[in-house]
Amino acid sequence: MSMSDPIADMLTRIRNAQQVEKMAVSMPSSKVKVAIAKVLKDEGYIEDFAVRGEAGKPELELQLKYYAGRPVIEHIERVSKPGLRIYKGAGDLPRVKNGLGVAIVSTSSGVMTDRHARAKGVGGEVLCFVA
């Protein structure tokens, strides 16, 4: 069965795993999912990630992070969807929780946070909000 929105599936798996306090969650891997996982790790929202499995069906495994018994990711939300893509210029990129959260943006320079995109002066598709 084909999946219409693999990024939304990734975010839902993370949200569900953290609600039941799992230490790790796995999902089918793709280049965009690995790039999102790298941003989440760089920003301190997950412990680590790894791509495992055979060449035909790689699996992305995320090690989730908790602080004082609570998930570090309080809120994770898909913004741009297959039926309604959301593109923003460098000056129009949204700030999440007044800068306490991040917007993950897919730009021509790769997947990065809203802060990095603003610093580079590039806009792109707003994939999700994380706080």
Swiss-Prot record:
InterPro entries: Ribosomal_uS8, Ribosomal_uS8_CS, Ribosomal_uS8_sf. GO terms for biological process: translation. One of its GO terms (cellular component) is ribonucleoprotein complex. The keyword Membrane does not apply. The keyword Zinc-finger does not apply. One of its GO terms (molecular function) is rRNA binding. Keywords: Ribonucleoprotein, Ribosomal protein, RNA-binding, rRNA-binding. Part of the 30S ribosomal subunit. Contacts proteins S5 and S12. Belongs to the universal ribosomal protein uS8 family. One of the primary rRNA binding proteins, it binds directly to 16S rRNA central domain where it helps coordinate assembly of the platform of the 30S subunit. This is Small ribosomal subunit protein uS8. It comes from Thiobacillus denitrificans (strain ATCC 25259 / T1). The lineage of its organism: Bacteria, Pseudomonadati, Pseudomonadota, Betaproteobacteria, Nitrosomonadales.
